[in-house]
Amino acid sequence: MPPANGKKGKKGGAAKAVRRIQYRPKSFKHSRFVKHAHFWSAAPEEDFDAILAEMQLADAKTAAKEATKKDAKGGKGKANGSAAATAAPEEAKQAWQAEIAAMKPIDEQFPDGKFPHGIDESPYYLKGKDGRVATDRESNEEKKALDISYEEVWQDYRRSAEAHRQVRKYVKSWIKPGMTMIEICERLETTSRRLIKEQGLEAGLAFPTGCSLNHCAAHYTPNAGDTTVLQYGDVCKIDYGIHVRGRLIDSAFTVHFDPKFDPLVEAVREATNAGIKESGIDVRLCDVGEIVEEVMTSHEVELDGKSYVVKPIRNLNGHSIAQYRIHAGKTVPIVKGGEQTKMEENEIYAIETFGSTGKGYVHDDMETSHYMKNFELADEKIPLRLQKSKGLLNLIDKNFATLAFCRRWIDRLGETKYLMALKDLCDKGIVDPYPPLCDVKGCYTAQWEHTILMRPTVKEVVSRGDDY
C-alpha cells in the first residue's frame, strides 16, 4: 500500500518524501477541506454531495427491493430472467463461502507457533557498496542474542506472511475476466479473515484490498454499488495486508490476462527485486531509489504498435512499517535523488515499485474508498458535536484503530447513513481520506511489493513465496 507523494527540494536536489498522514486532497469525493482557526468546516456544496450520495444509495436499495417483489410475483411455472440472474451469483457465492469455511487457519496448521521463514537474503545484506554494512552479523553472538529476543515479533510477521501467501495462491486460482471487483475483494477478504482467524484488533486485515485498474495505480477498492467488472484487457494491482497484533504484511502483485502486458509487469517485478537486493542495514534510501529507477527504465513495452519506456511513478514510494502503523515515517523512493537517511537495525520496510506507460506521476481521481485515522491525533480528544460522528468514531476505534479501512467494511458492521459523519471526521482531521491515485487515462500501471525484516543477523524477505 503506497504512501503519499514526494516533493522536489527548492534547488532540485534530494526529493523529500511527504508522509501520507499529511496528504490532504482537494474535494470530499476528491476530499476537499475548508480550514478555519480552530476547526475544520465543511463547504455547503460538499454537504449536498454527501446527502445526495446517501439518497442515491437509499434509492438503489429501494429499487432492488421492488425488483425482488416483482420477481416474486412472476407466477408459478414462469421463468423470470431477473430472478434467475440473481440466483446464479448467490449460489456461486455460497459455494465459495463453503470452500473458505473448510480452510484451516494458519495457527492451526502450525500448532507449535513456528511459522515458515521468509527468504533470508544474506549475501546481499552483508555486502554494502562501500563496506558500510558489517560482515559478521550472522556469526556475532551479541547480534544472535538480540535477534532471539525479538523472536515473538518475527513469528507474528511470519504468521501474517504465511496467510498472505496462501490467500494469494487461492486468489490466483479463480480470478478471471467477467468477475466484479466487489466479488474479487469480498472473496479475497473472506479468505484472509478465515486464514488469519480474525479477532478484533488482535488479528485481521491490515488495510482494504486494493484492486486498482490500468491507469489507476493505487487506493482503489469498490464502494457499495460499484458495478465495475474485470476485463481481459485490464492490468489489475492486487494490494492487501494482513496483521497479527498490529505486525502487518504489506505485499502486492499484478494480475493481467493479455500477454502484451508481460514486459510491463516483468519490468516492475525486476525493479522491486532490485530494490530488495539493494536494501539493508546502513543502506541509504536514495541508493535504493537509484537502482530501482535504473532497472525499471531499462525496459520497454510495445502496446498497439507504439513503444514506451517503463517509467517509475516518482511520487509513489515504499515505506517503513511499525506496529498498527502502515506508514511509519521513512519513505523508500523509486527514483534517484531521494533522502540520504539510512535503513536501521530492527526496522521493517515495504519495498514496492510502480511502473507506468504514462507520465510516471499520479494525482487524486475518482471516488474515495480508503480512509485511515490520523496517527498523530490518535490519542487526542477532539470535540464532536454530532452524535452520529461520535458513534462512527467509536466504531472506528473499536474495529480499526489506526489501521486503514474502507466504506465496505463500515457497511459490513451494519452502520448506515454514515457519510455525513465520516465527512465530519475528515473535516476535523481525525480521519484522513486517501483517494485513488491515477496517472493519465489510457496508460497502464503495474506494481509489485514485499515486506522485509531488518533483523540483527539477516535481512528476511518475510512475504516472499514460490510465486514472487
From Swiss-Prot:
Short name of any one Pfam family annotated for the protein: Peptidase_M24
Top-level taxon: Eukaryota
Documented EC number(s): 3.4.11.18
Ligand binding (substrate): 219, 327
GO molecular function: aminopeptidase activity; exopeptidase activity; initiator methionyl aminopeptidase activity; metal ion binding; metalloaminopeptidase activity; metalloexopeptidase activity
Record-level GO BP terms: germ cell proliferation; proteolysis
UniProt activity-regulation remark: Inhibited by the fumagillin analog, TNP-470.
Cofactor(s) this protein requires: Co(2+); Zn(2+); Mn(2+); Fe(2+)
Region Disordered, annotated ranges: 63-87
Top EC category: hydrolase
Reactions listed under catalytic activity: Release of N-terminal amino acids, preferentially methionine, from peptides and arylamides
Cofactor notes: Binds 2 divalent metal cations per subunit. Has a high-affinity and a low affinity metal-binding site. The true nature of the physiological cofactor is under debate. The enzyme is active with cobalt, zinc, manganese or divalent iron ions. Most likely, methionine aminopeptidases function as mononuclear Fe(2+)-metalloproteases under physiological conditions, and the catalytically relevant metal-binding site has been assigned to the histidine-containing high-affinity site.
Loss of function: phenotype: RNAi-mediated knockdown causes sterility due to a defect in germ cell proliferation and/or differentiation.
Binding positions (a divalent metal cation 2): 250, 319, 352, 449
Record GO cellular component, one term: cytoplasm
Similarity field: Belongs to the peptidase M24A family. Methionine aminopeptidase eukaryotic type 2 subfamily.
Described purpose of this protein according to its UniProt entry: Cotranslationally removes the N-terminal methionine from nascent proteins. The N-terminal methionine is often cleaved when the second residue in the primary sequence is small and uncharged (Met-Ala-, Cys, Gly, Pro, Ser, Thr, or Val). Required for germ cell proliferation and/or differentiation.
Listed name of the protein: Methionine aminopeptidase 2
Species of provenance: Caenorhabditis elegans
